[in-house]
Curated annotation (Swiss-Prot):
This is 31 kDa ribonucleoprotein, chloroplastic. Residues 88-166, 208-286 form the RRM domain. CDD domains: RRM2_NsCP33_like. Residues 167-207 are annotated as: Linker (Gly-rich). It comes from Nicotiana plumbaginifolia (Leadwort-leaved tobacco). Coiled coil: none annotated.
């Protein structure tokens, strides 16, 4: 077993000539380490002759980036990754497919210290799903990043950035912007609004609706819509929030325009990893109408 000691800290990326070795939904984590305490113990049997370690220059002089690999997971010895409050997490949507975790980290470090970056990938195709999550060090940096990068253009796309936890409730809100000035970015947080949805009191057909459970607290209507749009035309996407606290209850509903899209979504998305959780997708049971 070969051991490599790093004296001057830089970004380190372990790369392989085999693209399939990369783990989809890999998380890029940043954390401080003393310059003398980092040791990478790499098993020659798990890496092979094709692996290499390349320095990556960054303004972070005392931070280390480690990308998660299937075959290196047990061979890289580092400090345990700390947990961060959901208040420090940002959702980043409408990303170009070429943007990976390293590129996203390089952008958001302009607003402060980046702790964790995750771009969400499709397990089968390995392609980016066009959205991800960024965790900053402080709430002030979260606000700065949201103000600085919401609407920021990358490769011709204006990215969407908003904080993970639910903001204060607003009446009659919807993502698409109810006319008359009552719109809010995330939408659906007061139980009377929806992402793409029915405006002016029109009801949404619930016959083609799926239930989505075990959602991370940082997933909102926008993230849900971004994910499920890959399987068809999303008529409505809504995360259910607690009326008192305003926080996500960890589940939501997505409505499609056809039964085929519902079946495709269940087959393709049930059990996939979204922001560190294996989501549950099933046909939603229509609740019986109240009798008065």
């Amino acid at each position: 077993m070969a051991s490599s000691s790093v004296s001057s800290l830089q970004f380190l990326f372990v790369t392989s000539q085999t693209p399939s070795s990369l783990k989809p939904n890999s998380t890029l984590s940043f954390f401080s380490l003393p310059s003398s305490s980092l040791n990478l113990s790499l098993s020659s049997s798990s890496i092979g002759h094709s692996a290499s370690i390349k320095p990556f220059e960054s303004s972070f002089s005392t931070r280390v980036a480690l990308s998660d690999f299937d075959q290196l997971e047990d061979d890289v010895e580092v400090a345990e990754q700390p947990r961060f409050s959901e208040d420090l997490k940002l959702f980043v949507g409408n990303l170009p497919f070429s943007v990976d975790s390293a590129a996203l980290a390089g952008l958001f470090e302009r607003a402060g210290n980046v702790e964790i970056v995750e771009v969400i990938y499709d397990k089968l195709s390995g392609r980016s799903r066009g959205f991800g999550f960024v965790t900053m060090s402080t709430k002030e940096e979260v606000e700065a990043a949201e103000q600085q990068f919401n609407g920021y253009e990358i490769d011709g796309r204006a990215i969407r950035v908003n904080a993970g936890p639910a903001p204060a409730k607003r009446e009659n809100s919807s993502f698409g912007g109810g006319r008359g000035g009552n719109s809010s970015y995330g939408g659906g947080r007061d139980g009377n609004s929806s992402f793409g949805g029915a405006r002016g009191g029109r009801s949404v057909d619930s016959s083609n609706r799926v239930y989505v459970g075990n959602l991370s607290w940082g997933v909102d209507d926008l993230a849900l819509k971004e994910l499920f749009s890959e399987q068809g035309n999303v008529v409505d996407a809504k995360v259910v929030y607690d009326r008192d606290s305003g926080r996500s209850r960890g589940f939501g509903f997505v409505t499609y325009s056809s039964a085929k899209e519902v079946n495709d979504a269940i087959d393709s998305l049930n059990g996939i990893d979204l922001d560190g959780r294996s989501i549950r997708v099933s046909a939603a049971e229509e609740r019986p109408r109240r009798q008065f």
